[in-house]
Amino acid sequence: MTAQLIDGKSIAASLRQQIAQRVAERRQQGLRTPGLAVILVGSDPASQVYVSHKRKDCEEVGFLSQAYDLPSETTQEALTDLIDRLNDDPAIDGVLLQLPLPEHLDASKLLERIRPDKDVDGFHPYNVGRLAQRIPLLRPCTPKGIMTLLESTGADLYGMDAVVVGASNIVGRPMAMELLLAGCTVTVTHRFTKDLAGHVGRADLVVVAAGKPGLVKGEWIKEGAIVIDVGINRQEDGKLVGDVVYETALPRAGWITPVPGGVGPMTRACLLENTLYAAETLHA
């Protein structure tokens, strides 16, 4: 058996097309264009690439895109003032603060400064709390995108044993809550987990988001399991690889996401989807 690929690029392109169509309809109805402000502090190369992709996505679907590229020495006070201005700007539906930030800045305080109804990344404690209470509003983009990928497989998630490898605030923890909402029995593993291979081997669904290349071995995967690899790691030869050993997981899994071209495109598409939702529902 060889796993079927979950094509994140194709699914994300379809979602962007739907969003672009809705933006065009809004214009025809005389409604304003959804607006996204993206703040980049410093010159981290990976962040610059991510931000350029997000701005290109905005142009593709017809969003208003405002870019704020700030020097690495930008102060906490200056960033707070900028966020406050964007919070009060009626043309802006979403405010995105690109992480990581320079060490002298308090990311938690800045993320909490973004108004919850403009927190299109879904990182604000209010939005995470809504998800935990089973009444999600703006959902964290990567877990939300993964749920869309899972829907594309047609798999019935109810009653599945799901394992989330990695307990980060951005992916692991909200992912576990999304899977609980979908009816899975969820185990979250982390750096103190004693028998990672055993947990993975019992799982019908594995979501790996640890940022460690090759952490999950293909032979650990249960026959026919769904494997979602969130990791994206650049090797010395420049090749991008995930947290799962893809070549050995492929013959065992039922469905698997490639790296690149799996989860990443969906994260970006869900950022657009959240921004459109904010414009149409929260700022109507």
From Swiss-Prot:
InterPro entries: Aminoacid_DH-like_N_sf, NAD(P)-bd_dom_sf, THF_DH/CycHdrlase, THF_DH/CycHdrlase_cat_dom, THF_DH/CycHdrlase_NAD-bd_dom. GO terms for biological process: L-histidine biosynthetic process; methionine biosynthetic process; purine nucleotide biosynthetic process; tetrahydrofolate interconversion. The keyword Chloroplast does not apply. One of its GO terms (cellular component) is cytosol. It catalyses: (6R)-5,10-methylene-5,6,7,8-tetrahydrofolate + NADP(+) = (6R)-5,10-methenyltetrahydrofolate + NADPH; (6R)-5,10-methenyltetrahydrofolate + H2O = (6R)-10-formyltetrahydrofolate + H(+). Keywords: Amino-acid biosynthesis, Histidine biosynthesis, Hydrolase, Methionine biosynthesis, Multifunctional enzyme, NADP, One-carbon metabolism, Oxidoreductase, Purine biosynthesis. One of its GO terms (molecular function) is methylenetetrahydrofolate dehydrogenase (NADP+) activity. CDD domains: NAD_bind_m-THF_DH_Cyclohyd (cd01080). Catalyzes the oxidation of 5,10-methylenetetrahydrofolate to 5,10-methenyltetrahydrofolate and then the hydrolysis of 5,10-methenyltetrahydrofolate to 10-formyltetrahydrofolate. HAMAP family: THF_DHG_CYH. This is Bifunctional protein FolD.
